[in-house]
UniProtKB/Swiss-Prot annotation:
Keywords recorded for this protein, A-Z: Ribonucleoprotein, Ribosomal protein
UniProt organism field: Blochmanniella pennsylvanica (strain BPEN)
Pfam family, one: Ribosomal_S2
Superkingdom, natural source: Bacteria
Single biological process term from Gene Ontology: translation
Gene Ontology CC annotations of this record: cytosolic small ribosomal subunit
Alphabetized Gene3D superfamilies for the sequence: Glucose-6-phosphate isomerase like protein, domain 1, Helix hairpin bin
Keyword check for Heme: no
Family: Belongs to the universal ribosomal protein uS2 family.
Entry protein name: Small ribosomal subunit protein uS2
């Protein structure tokens, strides 16, 4: 199984945490030191913990489990979507709607509405409406697609979530915790690792770092799919 190399992590800036004044003391075990008032993450620890996370994700993927990738910050949005689609998995890459997991029955109704609107937009229904009516429905379709497009075919709650950024995705993590859904997350030095089953200490802001994590996970799931 491919793991994350120290060299690749250094090149991607995985080791750069936040300014020391913003740190969360609970991240102390994962910090190597300080450079120019910036916390430096211990990449040896990250390598070990990333491998542990990969092993567990591999088990879930091998059982055809559903993994929900969550990355709503700008730096993660496109990579999260690309990774999930490449892996035939699921994603939320815009705003996390409160209750997306804990109020799944209501979310399921919204997904049905999204699918109905998709059909109407393709079967000529929109063309039969006035311009104003069609515009209103098209806006609704776009909004629903942005919010729910990545989970519209999930068919139920995920078997795990992978969050890019523990602080930014704290609502998703809290909902997963309340439902007993395993949480994998990139956790930076300013974040609280509590409630995360598989902590991956690392920079959660740099696009290169985010791409590195997700590319390795994507490759692992692809290999798994080819071998089953």
């Amino acid at each position: 199984m491919e793991n994350i190399s120290i060299r690749d992590m250094l090149q991607a800036g995985v080791h750069f945490g936040h300014q020391t004044r913003y740190w969360n003391p609970k991240m102390k075990p994962f910090i190597f030191g300080v450079r120019n008032k910036i916390h430096i993450i211990d990449l040896e620890t990250t390598s070990v913990m990333f491998r542990q996370a990969l092993i567990e994700l591999n088990k879930i993927a091998a059982l055809k489990g559903k993994i929900l990738f969550v990355g709503t910050k700008r730096a993660a949005s496109e990579s999260v979507k690309k990774t999930a689609l490449a892996c035939n998995q699921f994603f939320v890459n815009h705003r996390w709607l409160g209750g997306m997991l804990t109020n799944w029955k209501t979310v399921r109704q919204s997904i049905k509405r999204l699918k109905d609107l998709e059909i109407q937009s393709q079967d000529g229904t929109f063309k039969k409406l006035t311009k104003k009516e069609a515009l209103i429905l098209n806006r609704e379709l776009i909004n629903l697609e942005n919010s729910l497009g990545g989970i519209k075919n999930m068919g139920g709650l995920p078997d795990a979530i992978f969050a890019v950024g523990a602080t930014h995705e704290h609502i998703a993590i809290k909902e997963a915790n309340s439902l007993g859904i395993p949480v994998f997350a990139i956790v930076d030095t300013n974040s609280n690792p509590d409630g995360i089953d598989f902590v991956i200490p690392g920079n959660d802001d740099a696009v290169r770092a985010i791409n590195l994590y997700l590319n390795i996970i994507s490759n692992m799931i692809h290999i798994n799919a080819c071998n089953t």
